[in-house]
């Protein structure tokens, strides 16, 4: 059956264990649409908000990528890893352990150097609050993680790092509007696996550690792994990320977003449009004739739906082109006549100060993205066909 190509956004709650591209592939396959993309990569270990555009809405992605974001994460203090997250190898640092004992003596009564000590969470709460307020809020400079997708002379930083080559990344300005400590758990780890859970008992050789649950709202381009690393370095005890969930991208939020940064009047209906997904496995034979098993992303739809029925269900849960445009950037209501002018590449008599979606509200027609031409006129920079 032939389909007209629809346009819109799907808000996917990405599961752990798959890449953002895996989620895009799942949407592409389910909707039978080639033109699909996402607004901001989530690492395989991360979960949460992945804004996926299809059809003409892919031309809104550049605007959405630039939006600020909210994350909920767990930072483990007391150790370091090679990747600054739980997917790397644990680095046991004698200097960091010595610093932990110094903090233990300072924050507890009778803390003795050389003994593994789990610090009271109340003492940590005050120390963390002061450290974060002083060093990790507002406008800061952040050095991205070595294992990141940033390109250096055409090569990804993580590829260079895996090859054992030295990677030097320059600090970047980012803005942290919120960095809140939500919960603290104190305990011990063996230090053999980065993802191992905390335990209460201190066996021989146990390493004291602290798991800190945080919520971070930040500008685009902020690395939460780098925040975990830098917080641990500032305290002198080491730190890395063990959990990461993105709850909000601009005005696109998951039902569990608790940032409170989206005003009720600006709230999009993304909470009822979110599509969950889960991780499964697929097995295939590669070009070398080898049998390969890897993870894949599977969109959660009602049981029994397949083909066109499953496609239509997903489209019903997608944001329309108009909703997508209004969520992606400022919007301006225009007349049908102005829409026609814009589609011919002509200017309209409107005063704007930033890139804006020009929409005919009566017909929900997104005509163009416009920008300031002069003090009294706006010009089209991206034109959309009449749906």
Curated annotation (Swiss-Prot):
Protein name per Swiss-Prot or TrEMBL: tRNA pseudouridine synthase B
Recorded catalytic activity of this chain's protein: uridine(55) in tRNA = pseudouridine(55) in tRNA
Disulfide bonds: none
Domain of life according to the entry: Bacteria
Function: Responsible for synthesis of pseudouridine from uracil-55 in the psi GC loop of transfer RNAs.
Gene: truB
Ranges annotated as spanning the membrane: none
A Gene Ontology molecular function term of the record: RNA binding
Sequence similarity: Belongs to the pseudouridine synthase TruB family. Type 1 subfamily.
Record Pfam families: TruB_C (PF09142), TruB_C_2 (PF16198), TruB_N (PF01509)
The organism of origin for this protein: Bifidobacterium longum subsp. infantis (strain ATCC 15697 / DSM 20088 / JCM 1222 / NCTC 11817 / S12)
Residues annotated as catalytic: 43 (nucleophile)
Assigned keywords, A-Z: Isomerase, tRNA processing
tRNA processing in keyword set: yes
Primary enzyme class: isomerase
InterPro entries assigned to the protein according to its UniProt record, in alphabetical order: PsdUridine_synth_cat_dom_sf, PsdUridine_synth_N, PUA_sf, tRNA_psdUridine_synth_fam2_C, tRNA_psdUridine_synth_TruB, TruB_C
Annotated GO biological process: mRNA pseudouridine synthesis; tRNA pseudouridine synthesis
EC number assigned by the record: 5.4.99.25
């Amino acid at each position: 059956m032939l389909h007209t190509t629809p346009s819109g956004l799907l808000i996917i709650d990405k599961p752990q264990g798959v890449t953002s591209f895996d989620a895009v592939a799942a949407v592409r396959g389910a909707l039978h649409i080639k033109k699909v993309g996402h607004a901001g990569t989530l690492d395989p270990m991360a979960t949460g908000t992945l804004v996926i555009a299809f059809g003409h809405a892919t031309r809104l992605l550049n605007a959405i990528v630039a939006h600020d974001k909210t994350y909920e994460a767990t930072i483990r203090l007391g150790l370091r890893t090679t990747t600054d997250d739980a997917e790397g190898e644990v680095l046991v640092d004698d200097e960091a352990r010595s610093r932990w004992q110094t903090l233990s003596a300072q924050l507890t009564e009778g803390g003795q150097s050389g003994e593994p000590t789990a610090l009271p969470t109340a003492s940590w709460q005050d120390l963390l609050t002061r450290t974060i307020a002083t060093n990790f809020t507002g406008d800061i400079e952040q050095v991205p993680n070595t294992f990141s997708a940033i390109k250096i002379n055409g090569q990804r930083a993580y590829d260079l790092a895996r090859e054992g080559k030295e990677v030097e990344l320059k600090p970047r300005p980012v803005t942290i509007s919120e960095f809140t400590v939500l919960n603290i758990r104190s305990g011990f780890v063996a230090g053999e696996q980065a993802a191992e859970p905390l335990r209460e008992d201190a066996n021989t050789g146990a390493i004291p550690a602290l798991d800190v649950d945080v919520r971070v709202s930040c500008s685009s381009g902020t690395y939460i792994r780098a925040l975990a690393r830098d917080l641990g370095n500032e305290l002198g005890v080491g730190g890395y990320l063990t959990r990461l969930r993105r709850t909000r991208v601009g005005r696109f939020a998951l039902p569990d977003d608790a940032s409170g940064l989206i005003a009720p009047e600006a709230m999009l209906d993304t909470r009822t449009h979110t599509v969950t997904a889960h991780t499964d496995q697929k097995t295939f034979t590669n070009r070398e004739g080898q049998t390969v098993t890897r993870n894949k992303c599977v969109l959660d739809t009602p049981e029994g739906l397949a083909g066109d029925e499953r496609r239509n269900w997903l489209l019903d849960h997608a944001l329309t082109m108009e909703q997508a445009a209004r969520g992606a950037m400022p919007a301006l209501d225009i007349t049908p006549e102005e829409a026609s002018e814009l589609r011919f590449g002509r200017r309209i008599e409107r005063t704007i100060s930033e890139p804006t979606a020009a929409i005919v509200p009566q017909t929900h027609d997104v005509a163009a993205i416009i920008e300031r031409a002069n003090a009294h006129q706006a010009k089209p920079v991206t034109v959309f066909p009449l749906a």
